[in-house]
UniProtKB/Swiss-Prot annotation:
SUPFAM superfamilies in the cross-refs: Adenine nucleotide alpha hydrolases-like (SSF52402), Rhodanese/Cell cycle control phosphatase (SSF52821), THUMP domain-like (SSF143437)
Reaction catalysis annotation: [ThiI sulfur-carrier protein]-S-sulfanyl-L-cysteine + a uridine in tRNA + 2 reduced [2Fe-2S]-[ferredoxin] + ATP + H(+) = [ThiI sulfur-carrier protein]-L-cysteine + a 4-thiouridine in tRNA + 2 oxidized [2Fe-2S]-[ferredoxin] + AMP + diphosphate; [ThiS sulfur-carrier protein]-C-terminal Gly-Gly-AMP + S-sulfanyl-L-cysteinyl-[cysteine desulfurase] + AH2 = [ThiS sulfur-carrier protein]-C-terminal-Gly-aminoethanethioate + L-cysteinyl-[cysteine desulfurase] + A + AMP + 2 H(+)
Binding site for ATP: L184, I185, K266, G288, Q297
Protein name: tRNA sulfurtransferase
InterPro entries: Rhodanese-like_dom (IPR001763), Rhodanese-like_dom_sf (IPR036873), Rossmann-like_a/b/a_fold (IPR014729), ThiI_AANH (IPR020536), ThiI_fer (IPR054173), ThiI_N (IPR049961), THII_Thiazole_biosynth_dom (IPR026340), THUMP_dom (IPR004114)
Subcellular location: Cytoplasm
EC numbers, comma separated: 2.8.1.4
Group of enzyme by EC: transferase
Domain THUMP: from-to ranges: 62-166
Taxonomy of the source species: Bacteria, Pseudomonadati, Pseudomonadota, Gammaproteobacteria, Pseudomonadales
Active-site residues, record numbering mapped to chain: C456 (cysteine persulfide intermediate)
Keyword Transit peptide belongs to the record: no
BP term (GO), one: thiamine diphosphate biosynthetic process
Length: 484
């Protein structure tokens, strides 16, 4: 299978040195990710395209396309057939072979490109192929403005290709072509979408989590960060930094006027984030704020919050409404995480200020013990995001079962996108599909007289959740770990 990849339009209009650098980075990202599927996949290209040659007969088409549509910087992916150029009639014949079935009852338009020295123009090619398709198929007709199907052909010197199928990419810039940032992540809708939008823009992002007091919350946020990285950013290594913020929260509640709690908490986070970001050479901070979504997100309050640091603060969601944010979360697969994420609500005032005054906020902060923030920063931990799930602590040891009995029920806890790519099928056992983020809710509703074995590809997620469920009193939960 041969694929033709076009970069996002913004890449194509850059100056030559910038375009070369961005295309080089895009090829490098594609090559690194596809090599995990098969090291024999070839990735080449030129200034305005990337060519991918996938070995046939290895069932790689689906996995390769699935990987490519999630790589930032790609506009379109076309599955193409490549042929030696003979004449226009031959191009028409090949087009009929490729499109006749799909054109039944549909309108179409031929879009042609030509490179090299030929005795015909691109429009001549379009007309010739269009006539062949009208004669050789049951197409409804030609519609140049809004066709049901576009037939894409490109002639280059003494060869040509016909696009069989076209897939839309993420767009944006290749990851790694813009400076690195630090994204403040809570696992909710806003921060996960903000992190995704940064990656889509080509910005490598570390993840910074402020733990306000819940172990379950950190476990959930680790899963979100790992999912985002694995789906959209795994061409680059990044860190997950966790800051124990319980002491800072307690100090705020002791020393600060309750109306300022929310604003001061954000300022403390920003102060800590700015100091930590410098240690990781991050050029900016990313937050998931949207104007007026909550009381601390008025323009006045955001201005007061930003005065806590000299670092640039990026807010990609600033003008989005909540439904738009949730729609993107659904599209990228983080909505179920956010919907089931445990929340910590210890710093919510009954009458939060909406127009904070900087001098009054600073007067409140002066009452705080600076050691609380310094200790939190000093006691932070960091983990490579690629190792996040491996390093998550399991509260209870759980039994691993290689061969289940016929009465055991297997629970596939993988994310639906992973389960669809590689379904689990067993002959002698019932298999339930319960994504890990819905386990806590659904396990309580299962019959208690059965034994349940949790399953995931690597065994890490299943062991972690089985351990948490066992700690909560579910003694009939174990792990299905088939022999490799």
């Amino acid at each position: 299978m041969k694929l033709l990849i076009r970069p996002a339009p913004e890449v194509a209009i850059k100056s030559k040195p910038v375009r070369q650098q961005q295309m080089r980075q895009l090829r490098q990202n594609i090559r690194k990710l596809l090599a995990r599927l098969d090291p024999e996949i070839r990735v080449d290209g030129s200034w305005d395209r990337v060519d991918v040659d996938v070995p046939d007969g290895r069932s790689l088409a689906g996995p390769v396309i699935d990987e490519l549509v999630r790589i930032p910087g790609i506009s379109t992916i076309q599955e193409i057939g490549v042929f030696p150029f003979v004449d226009l009639d031959d191009v028409g014949e090949k087009a009929v072979q490729a499109y006749a079935e799909r054109l039944k009852g549909k309108t179409f338009a031929v879009r042609a490109r030509r490179h090299g020295d030929h005795d015909f123009r691109s429009i001549d090619l379009e007309r010739s192929v269009g006539a062949a398709l009208l004669q050789g198929s049951d197409a409804k007709g030609v519609d140049l403005k809004s066709p049901d199907l576009e037939v894409r052909i490109e002639v280059k010197d003494d060869s040509y290709h016909i696009a069989h199928r076209r897939h839309e990419g993420l767009g944006g810039y290749p990851l790694g072509t813009v400076e690195t940032v630090m994204t403040l992540i809570s696992g909710g809708y806003d921060s996960s979408v903000a992190a995704y939008l940064m990656m889509r823009r080509g910005i490598r992002s570390h993840y910074l989590f402020f733990n306000l007091g819940g172990a379950a919350h950190e476990v959930g946020v680790r899963q979100v960060a790992h999912y985002l990285w694995e789906r959209y950013g795994s061409s680059h290594n990044v860190k997950f930094i966790s800051v124990p913020f319980e002491g800072v929260v307690a100090e705020i509640m002791r020393s600060v006027n309750h109306r300022h709690w929310g604003v001061v908490l954000k300022r403390m986070m920003l102060k800590a984030a700015a100091e930590i970001a410098r240690d990781y050479n991050a050029s900016g901070l990313v937050m998931g704020d949207a104007v007026a979504q909550v009381s601390s997100q008025t323009l006045t309050n955001l201005n007061v919050v930003d005065r806590a640091s000299d670092e640039v603060v990026l807010r990609p969601l600033i003008a989005m409404d909540k439904q738009e944010i949730i729609r993107i979360a659904k599209d990228i697969g983080t909505e179920p995480f956010a919907r089931n994420m445990p929340e910590y609500c210890g710093v919510i005032s009954s009458k939060p200020v909406t127009r904070a005054r900087l001098h009054r906020v600073e007067e409140d902060e002066a009452n705080m013990d600076p050691a609380a923030l310094a200790d939190a920063i000093a006691n932070r931990t960091d983990t490579m995001v690629s190792q996040l799930l491996d390093s998550t602590q399991t509260p209870e040891e759980v039994e691993l079962i290689q061969t289940p009995s016929v009465d055991d029920v297997i629970i596939d806890v993988r994310h639906p996108s992973e389960e669809e790519r590689s379904p689990l099928t067993l002959t002698n056992n019932d298999v339930l599909k319960i994504p890990f983020y819905e386990l806590n809710q659904q396990v309580a509703e299962l019959p208690g007289n059965r034994q349940y074995l949790l399953y995931c590809d690597r065994g890490t997620m299943s062991r972690m959740h089985a351990g948490h469920l066992k700690a909560e009193g579910h003694g009939n939960i174990k792990v299905y770990a088939p022999a490799v």
